[in-house]
Each structure stands twice: as C-alpha cells, then as structure tokens.
Amino acid sequence: MNRLLSVFALGGAVLLAGCVAPTPKPNDPYYAPVLPRTPLPAAANNGSIYQAGFEQNLYSDRKAFRVGDIITITLNEKTSASKNAGSQIQKNSKADIGLTSLFGSTPNTNNPFGGGDLSLEAGYNGERATKGDSKATQGNTLTGSITVTVAEVLPNGIIAVRGEKWLTLNTGEELVRIAGMVRADDIATDNTVPSTRVADARITYSGTGSFADASQPGWLDRFFISPLWPF
C-alpha cells in the first residue's frame, strides 16, 4: 500500500513539474545580434569622376534598412480581455404504457398473493437539469524600449528584426525579447518604431530570481487550479 502511494505521489510531482514554465536562458542564438554581411571588394579606380560603390543619395535618410543595422522599438502594449459563458440544459421525459392484451390474448391478472389484481400498465417520469456559469478577465500593460538589429531584408522591403535585453538586478534578472516584421515606412528618422507597428510580433517579458519565483504559485496551488483537480 505504501509503495502504491509513493508511486502516485511521484507521478503527481512529475505532472505538476510539467506545468512549470521553463526558465529563460541568456545567449539564445535566435536573438543574438546579426552582423552585417561581408562587403564585396571595391571596384578598381579607373580614373573616372563617378566611381561605382561611392555614390551618395542626396534625398535618402539614414534609416535602418540593411542587415545588422540597429532599430529601437518603443514598447507600448496594452491588452484586456474578458469572457463570460453560461449554459443551461434541462430535459424532461414521461412515458405511460398500458397493456390490455399480450400476444393477442388477455392475460390473467389475478394476484395469487392477494391485495388486488395485477396490472400490466407502467409509467416513467424523469427530469434532468444542468446549469453552469464561468467568467474570466485578463489585462496586461508593457511600456519601455528595446534596441534590436535587422536580421533580414525581404525582397518586398519588409525588415525582419529581433533582439533581447537582459537587466541584472540584485535578486535576479529581467528579460525582454522581441521579434517581428517592420515596414521601412514606419521607421522614424531617429530609427525608432512603435511596437504596435511590428507585424507578427513575438514579445516576451520574463525574469529569474526571487521576484520571479514569488509571482509563481506553489505546487499545491497549481494542483488545485489544474485540470487534475476533480471538483
């Protein structure tokens, strides 16, 4: 019996451990800075006034549009969601069965034990009802800024950016990661773009240390709010 309880306890601990979010780790290669590609060798000077590779556009600004360029993304995210759900199911059923003949003949309904004649009539009456209500609300706000690098420039001019920021504090570390697609026209002259203009954005805000651990529920609390709780 004790061995069986130990097996159940170990299985429950493993299931609850799987509910814990993995701790973020630094130096993720996906968010590593992307360096500019090695430039091609410069063409030999042939003595002409206009040399290929030395041109300058008088009307273009210095927006980031090449691989390895730096862009600052201003974070201004605010989301809120609420959901209400209700269900009610009710079912009533009733059946009355009356038999006067059985296989074409009238059966004998005399009660051999006394107390009146037997009856072939039967009846059924049933009622079932189920009612449930649920409500959930959630809100998130994230403000700040993070500087990332251009990882890729697509043929249509869309820029893929990604990067991360780690802040080392006394009791742990704070992490901000972002990846997404930016349109060159949305980049301001100071190489900034709001996060609301980043398409297919993947924004992560997490941390490690005592502050991050304090915001996590304990293993027993996770059991009570998990699908394993039968009530």
UniProtKB/Swiss-Prot annotation:
Origin: domain of life: Bacteria
Gene Ontology molecular function: cytoskeletal motor activity
Signal peptide range in chain numbering: 1-18
Protein's cellular compartments: Cell outer membrane; Bacterial flagellum basal body
Protein name: Flagellar L-ring protein
InterPro entries with a match to the protein in the record: Flag_Lring
Single biological process term from Gene Ontology: bacterial-type flagellum-dependent cell motility
Job description of the protein: Assembles around the rod to form the L-ring and probably protects the motor/basal body from shearing forces during rotation.
GO cellular component: bacterial-type flagellum basal body, distal rod, L ring; cell outer membrane
Organism: Pseudomonas putida (strain GB-1)
Keywords annotated in UniProt: Bacterial flagellum, Cell outer membrane, Lipoprotein, Membrane, Palmitate, Signal
Lipid attachment, kind N-palmitoyl cysteine: C19
S-diacylglycerol cysteine lipid attachment residues: C19
Membrane topology type: Lipid-anchor
Quaternary structure, from the entry: The basal body constitutes a major portion of the flagellar organelle and consists of four rings (L,P,S, and M) mounted on a central rod.
Main localisation: membrane
Xref: Pfam families: FlgH
